[in-house]
Amino acid sequence: MDDVNSIVLAAGQAAEEGGTNNFLVPNGTFFFVLAIFLVVLAVIGTFVVPPILKVLRERDAMVAKTLADNKKSAEQFAAAQADYEKAMAEARVQASSYRDNARAEGRKVVEDARAHAEQEVASTLQQANEQLKRERDAVELDLRANVGAMSATLANRIVGVDVTTPAAAG
């Protein structure tokens, strides 16, 4: 370091003694600044750049891993969505089948109830017809049995003569 100082001082004295002051010609200051620059560059290149590069590489690796995870997640989501759609389609088909079966069973129950009601109506009508026939037969027998007495009573009321006596009969 002592040599550098002496060079700088010598260059400064030479300039004062009447040397040319051309800034394009390198002097001792230039070499001293160049040496300091190279030392600082070496220190930065040795101690600063490698940790920064390491952090940047780790960040790039993390970004790449995140992208891969996102892609994998998207594929898993697409597969799950496809499975969901497939399951929903199967469920819709099964629900449609259950609904159709329920409708068919409902129609069958309604038809059975209708047939049972028609059968009850037919038996009720048959019983009513039989009862009416029995009552008609009973009324007919009663009328046949009482027709003579009723006609005599009617003739008595209309004619005013007792037609039930044996003299009127002859």
Curated annotation (Swiss-Prot):
Coiled coil: none annotated. CDD domains: ATP-synt_Fo_b. The keyword Membrane applies. Keywords: ATP synthesis, Cell membrane, CF(0), Hydrogen ion transport, Ion transport, Membrane, Transmembrane, Transmembrane helix, Transport. It is found in: Cell membrane. GO terms for molecular function: proton-transporting ATP synthase activity, rotational mechanism; proton-transporting ATPase activity, rotational mechanism. The chain crosses the membrane at residues 30-50. It holds the Pfam family ATP-synt_B. The keyword Secreted does not apply. SUPFAM superfamilies: F1F0 ATP synthase subunit B, membrane domain. It is a single-pass membrane protein. GO terms for cellular component: plasma membrane; proton-transporting ATP synthase complex. This is ATP synthase subunit b. It comes from Mycobacterium marinum (strain ATCC BAA-535 / M). The gene is atpF.
